[in-house]
């Protein structure tokens, strides 16, 4: 297990917990990529990634992540969590997984997978047979 990756995972989670976007972005490489699978096209580069994160925090200012497990590997970590946020006055919760590639002690890529059908059900939206 890489101590460097483990420390990054801890600090990254702490920065997200307090919505410190500057601290989050300081842990990303210049050519970082963020992909919210099923939600948007990948954001490539520091500026685009920051914009994507800022948009999420603006849409869900009370977003919280309760970590369930973190798996540390060589050059990556995987974070399993429960996300909660308020959308149009409704509290929504769903499971999520982040797969984070690390290069030089910083986040090179963040792939986020959320339980979109659970979010859609809680918002009263129809779910497709493919995403269910």
Label the predicted regions:
Residues 3, 18-74:
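A solvent-exposed, acidic/Ser-Thr-rich amphipathic alpha-helical stretch
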Residues 12, 24-25, 32, 45, ...:
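Hydrophobic pocket/interface hotspot
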Residues 28, 83-85, 114:
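Short beta-strand segments enriched in hydrophobic/aromatic residues
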Residues 59, 84-93:
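Short, cysteine-centered beta-strand-loop-beta hairpins and adjacent loop/turn segments enriched
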Residues 64-65, 92-98:
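Short, surface-exposed coil-to-beta transition loops
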Residues 74-83:
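A short hydrophobic beta-strand element
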Residues 111-132:
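Low-complexity, intrinsically disordered terminal/linker segments enriched in charged
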